[in-house]
Curated annotation (Swiss-Prot):
GO BP terms in the entry: translation
Listed GO CC annotations: cytosolic small ribosomal subunit
Its job: One of the primary rRNA binding proteins, it binds specifically to the 5'-end of 16S ribosomal RNA.
Gene, per the UniProt record: rpsQ
Family listed: Belongs to the universal ribosomal protein uS17 family.
Alphabetized Pfam families for the sequence: Ribosomal_S17
HAMAP family registered for this protein in UniProt: Ribosomal_uS17_B (MF_01345_B)
Organism: Gluconobacter oxydans (strain 621H) (Gluconobacter suboxydans)
Annotated protein name in UniProt: Small ribosomal subunit protein uS17
Alphabetical keyword list: Ribonucleoprotein, Ribosomal protein, RNA-binding, rRNA-binding
Residues passing through the membrane, by range: none
GO terms for MF: rRNA binding; structural constituent of ribosome
Cross-referenced InterPro entries: NA-bd_OB-fold, Ribosomal_uS17, Ribosomal_uS17_bact/chlr
Length: 90
């Protein structure tokens, strides 16, 4: 089964190697046909602590890292973290 990939905005980066990502989605009310905003927060693993509050990130499902963390950050503001880490170290 493929891993799920979601896109959201970082709301907190105060933890070490962890960011909180807020995902907004719109659903239609079944009776009134009005669109309602629903949101959910995910704890995602940020290995190199590069994400900051307000960043747009893509997170990917992974094996459990801790009790709450089963997602890891794949890209930040449109660029992959693997390529960003190699350019920072060079």
């Amino acid at each position: 089964m493929p891993r799920r990939v979601l896109t959201g905005r970082v709301t907190s980066d105060k933890m070490d190697k962890t960011v909180t990502v807020l995902l907004d989605r719109r659903i239609m009310h079944p009776l009134y046909k009005k669109f309602i905003r629903r949101s959910k927060k995910y704890a995602a693993h940020d290995e190199e602590n590069v994400c900051q509050t307000g960043d747009l990130v893509r997170i990917e499902e992974c094996a459990p890292i801790s009790k709450r963390k089963t997602w890891s950050v794949v890209s930040r503001n449109g660029e992959d973290l693997a390529s960003a880490s190699s350019s920072v170290s060079a």
